Swiss-Prot record:
<dbReference type="InterPro" id="IPR036008">
    <property type="entry name" value="Aconitase_4Fe-4S_dom"/>
</dbReference>
<dbReference type="GO" id="GO:0009098">
    <property type="term" value="P:L-leucine biosynthetic process"/>
</dbReference>
<dbReference type="InterPro" id="IPR050067">
    <property type="entry name" value="IPM_dehydratase_rel_enz"/>
</dbReference>
<keyword id="KW-0004">4Fe-4S</keyword>
<keyword id="KW-0432">Leucine biosynthesis</keyword>
<keyword id="KW-0479">Metal-binding</keyword>
<keyword id="KW-0411">Iron-sulfur</keyword>
<protein>
    <recommendedName>
        <fullName>3-isopropylmalate dehydratase large subunit</fullName>
        <ecNumber>4.2.1.33</ecNumber>
    </recommendedName>
</protein>
<comment type="function">
    <text>Catalyzes the isomerization between 2-isopropylmalate and 3-isopropylmalate, via the formation of 2-isopropylmaleate.</text>
</comment>
<keyword id="KW-0408">Iron</keyword>
<dbReference type="InterPro" id="IPR001030">
    <property type="entry name" value="Acoase/IPM_deHydtase_lsu_aba"/>
</dbReference>
<dbReference type="GO" id="GO:0046872">
    <property type="term" value="F:metal ion binding"/>
</dbReference>
<dbReference type="InterPro" id="IPR004430">
    <property type="entry name" value="3-IsopropMal_deHydase_lsu"/>
</dbReference>
<dbReference type="InterPro" id="IPR033941">
    <property type="entry name" value="IPMI_cat"/>
</dbReference>
<dbReference type="InterPro" id="IPR015931">
    <property type="entry name" value="Acnase/IPM_dHydase_lsu_aba_1/3"/>
</dbReference>
<feature type="binding site">
    <location>
        <position position="407"/>
    </location>
    <ligand>
        <name>[4Fe-4S] cluster</name>
    </ligand>
</feature>
<keyword id="KW-0456">Lyase</keyword>
Amino acid sequence: MAKSLFQKVWDAHTVRKLANGQTQLLIGTHLIHEVTSPQAFGMLRDLGLKVAFPQRTFATVDHIVPTDQVVEPYRDPLAQAMMDELRKNCAEFGITFFDRSTGKQGIVHIVGPEQGITQPGTTIACGDSHTSTHGAFGAIAFGIGTSQVRDVLATQTMALGPLKVRRIEVNGKLRPGVYAKDVILHIIRTLGVNGGTGFAYEYAGEVFDRFSMEERMTVCNMSIEGGARVGYVNPDDTTFTYLKGRPYAPKGAAWDEAVTRWRAVASDSGCRYDDVVKINAADIAPTVTWGINPGQGISINEQIPDPAKATDADEKANIEEALAYMKLQPGAPIKGTKINVAFLGSCTNGRLSDFQEVAKFVKGKRVAAGVKAIAVPGSQIVALQCEKLGLDKILSEAGFEWRAAGCSMCLAMNPDKLIGDQLCASSSNRNFKGRQGSPTGRTILMSPLMVAAAAVTGQVADAREVFGVSAN
């Protein structure tokens, strides 16, 4: 019987079916960070339990670390306390910790892949919403809560309800100036922020076949923003080339055996899906959000929605709420909206290729007067790669502040925060109310190059026009 990758991985990791309809799943890899793990370790101590398989758990610090300070003690005592607590917990329970002193620290969803910890055909859990990033490698990866972090630490298993599988095919060729971020924003806009509830998304088609691993990670990262618990791409030669030689990837004969196994985990031809969505790549334009969830998106040349044209009362109320918070006018073009801050980074777009693309076009240009622009690499390794290529200098000369690795302004748990009702052009993944540190701060999501275009013009702009983009 033909099976999807999701069904194969689910079946291979099923421990038992539970009476409540859930499945007890073996978790192949567990990733932790400083925010959702302290309470879980505390519960282990209270119960007198050990970590069942410490070799399957990997830790890093990312959410609260300051990006403008690397020397300890940190100015923020909470950041220092959380860093110290994670160090203590990892040492006590024998868990590998990618601390800042290792040169391998960074956002957990960037560290896992670059270390070769993220691999096809396994299950991956982490106490973070954007764990679906790892699905780019053909893994079933999902975010979990603190009590589930405890369960995985104690048993290497957790309970999860069944999911349906929706295949999303994007065929054709993307137009110049359209990036992976535009693809996922278009998908979420099309299917809605709740459209994926109860689903795993399988991304496929000619566009994904051509995408690099970093582009696939960008798309899978935001699956949860469309309601999907899981998002994945079938593993192929692009996957294997990326993984080969990385620290935790198999070596020698074990590598050949792994590739054979990984090829077999891909969805079978003729397997059944619960739903199939087909999208023409030519229909995707540079896309930005205008509202207060990632599904409230429009192409750069569209107008801000008018609640008077809503199809029902709920949609009308949602548009009105978003317009009031964002201080935007219905029917006005989104292009030309003034910005105060530009943020490059996050687990969505904080990888080497993101900074390479931006540096290529901002070289010789300057951030507009009155705009604060920061560039935050997703890991220490990404930072080092950028610095070896001189990308940090290009960005700094253009007026961006080059920072140390961390989550930074994506969720603003560290000092990188908006002030008042500042509007930020952001390459991150969420534009919720207050997401970037100020209860009245405003966020517009877009691709890294669109962030750069906004930074140098001081307003939401079409990067194709600003930089003369003719090819990706």
